[in-house]
Amino acid sequence: PGVWNSTSDGFEINFVGKGGHGSRPHVTIDPVMMAGRFIVDVQSVISREKDAARFGVVTVGAVQAGSAGNIIPDTALLRGTIRSHDEATRTRMIDGVERTAKAVALMAGAPPPEIKITAGAKAVFNDEKLAARSGAVLKAAFGDKARLVPEPGAASEDYSEFVMAGVPSFYFGLGGLDP
């Protein structure tokens, strides 16, 4: 019963600098440096702004910038995901991602970055009564092989749309764990 998995929001951040040759970095605004600083600095949102007792993670999974090792590009594009188990943590982390990206660009003397947050699936909440009834049926059918997963996971699932619509729900996996 309760939270089964996490929310999942996507983000794209495009840092815009001023490209140039690697031999003259002083006449550029390096978006790769901004991207690197953001990747490191955004982790402080998790460690210093999010309640330590709440789940939340920000992952940068893609970085695209430049075409050669001796050329500072004009832009650096980051793509990532923000995951949490509750709306307050989700909101705080989205705010932190946006604020950190803007601050990094400001420190570099660059224009504000282009930030796109894409709302994804909400967390799935299992109905307590339905979970108890269904759990008893699964236990009767599978005996000791039926296991309750005690902690919610970090995966996401659009099944949450049923829950958000008010449908009493119980989400479970069958054969999803090693025997």
Q: Over which residues does each language-model region extend?
A:
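Generic structural marker for isolated residues within well-ordered, non-membrane alpha-helices
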Residues: 101, 135, 159
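Zn-dependent metallopeptidase/amidohydrolase metal-coordination segment
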Residues: 147-179
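Short, structured loop/turn "capping" segments at alpha-beta junctions
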Residues: 111, 144-145
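Midchain, well-structured core segments that form catalytic/ion-binding scaffolds
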Residues: 1-126, 153-156
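Acidic, glycine-rich loop-and-strand cores that form catalytic or ligand-binding grooves
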Residues: 139-143
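Short, low-order "capping/linker" segments at domain edges
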Residues: 124-137
